[in-house]
A protein has these predicted regions:
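Core segments of cupin and vicinal oxygen chelate
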Residues: 3-45, 84, 88-91, 96, ...
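A general structural signal for stabilizing positions within well-ordered secondary structure
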Residues: 63, 113-114
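Vicinal oxygen chelate
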Residues: 1-6, 37-40, 59-85, 108
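A short, acidic/glycine-rich surface segment
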Residues: 24, 55-60
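Amphipathic N-proximal alpha-helical interface segments
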Residues: 51, 55, 122-125
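Hydrophobic, ordered structural segments
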Residues: 73-80, 88-94, 99-102, 114-127
Length: 129
């Protein structure tokens, strides 16, 4: 789950202090214009996203909607095959080609109009993650 935030320090404190999540990774993803944090929860993660500028996709989201749930992500073994299958099924891809995400993963987004109103991210984790 990706959560757009305005103050990443306060968000980390909220999740660590109240929901027993642990900071797993933090980096700036310049290509997406965000500071991203992964918090461990069970076998998955919550991803916190702070926009680096107001004209980035997450910055525009926060300006329009305020902080909150941004997207749901699903890990796959082969993002290229998954995107091909999804496109063939008629779903609308925001990204026809994967781009680099957190921890050098390969990511692509599907448009909410074809996924029940939910911005959906497909993630092929880099080796070892």
């Amino acid at each position: 789950v990706g959560v757009a935030v305005e103050d990443i320090g306060a968000a980390i404190a909220l999740y660590e202090g109240n929901f027993e999540m642990a900071l797993a990774h933090r980096e700036t993803v310049e290509s997406q214009g965000v500071e991203a944090v992964l918090l461990d929860v069970g076998e998955g993660h919550v991803e916190l996203l702070r926009p680096l500028a107001p004209d980035t996709p997450v910055g525009k989201f926060v300006a329009k909607n305020g902080p909150g749930l941004h997207h749901v992500a699903y890990a796959v073994d082969d993002i290229d095959a998954t995107l091909e299958r999804i496109a063939a099924a008629g779903l609308t891809l925001i990204d026809r080609e994967p781009r680099v995400g957190i921890r050098d993963s390969r990511v692509a987004f599907l448009h909410p109009r074809s996924t029940g109103g939910v911005l959906t991210e497909i993630v092929e984790p880099a080796g070892g993650h």
